[in-house]
Amino acid sequence: MPAFFLFIRYINTELTKRECSEARFTHNGKRYFAIAFPNASGGFEVRNRYFKGCIAPKEISHIRQSGKARNTCYVFEGFMDYLSFLTLRQESCPNYPELDGQDYIVLNSVSNVNKALYPLGSYERIHCFFDNDHAGMEALQQIRKEYGRDRYIRDASQIYRGCKDLNEYLQKQIERKRQLQSAKGVRSQSPEKKNGFRL
């Protein structure tokens, strides 16, 4: 697993090993490796520091929990935002992160929002963690247009307002925490109380 890339984005490596695999490929005679995130049709989203693409077919990813069917689904634009969410939950509540309390859908592109509408129909509560831009708002409005009358649709992007996306929010949170710990470490060794990341 290309941990150097995950460290830059402050993604939890163990969570990523569970959710992703490693892809190795050759391009122009050079060998590369990347993170590969599976989708619902057997394809993969592929990412490394220099490359962002997919192994066809392009499709959404639908992560369903085992056991009793969940009535809540969290929806993300890309898998880096999904991994950022898991990391934030794990960091703030390491003993009870509640990662399996809901299902997840990763669009793998806002252009795939239509493909997500049918599976979203089985959920009572939908939380959308889209980018804070026009495309993200359009995707949210499309889901609200389809299900807004009889389902709870939440715009969770308000949590990271001022950031482009959830991954940027994660990076800023961890950088801020490290700066505070560094400053406090000079004066005190007392542990910092966690505020938590509840969604």
Residue positions per predicted region:
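Basic, glycine-enriched DNA-binding surface that flanks or lies within the catalytic cores of DNA
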Residues: 1-60, 64-65
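Short coil/turn segments at beta-strand junctions that form active-site/ligand-binding loops
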Residues: 70-72, 124-125
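Short hydrophobic beta-strand that contains or immediately precedes a catalytic carboxylate
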Residues: 74-77
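Acidic, divalent-metal-coordinating active-site segment for phosphoryl/phosphodiester hydrolysis
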Residues: 80-81, 139
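TOPRIM fold recognition
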Residues: 89-199
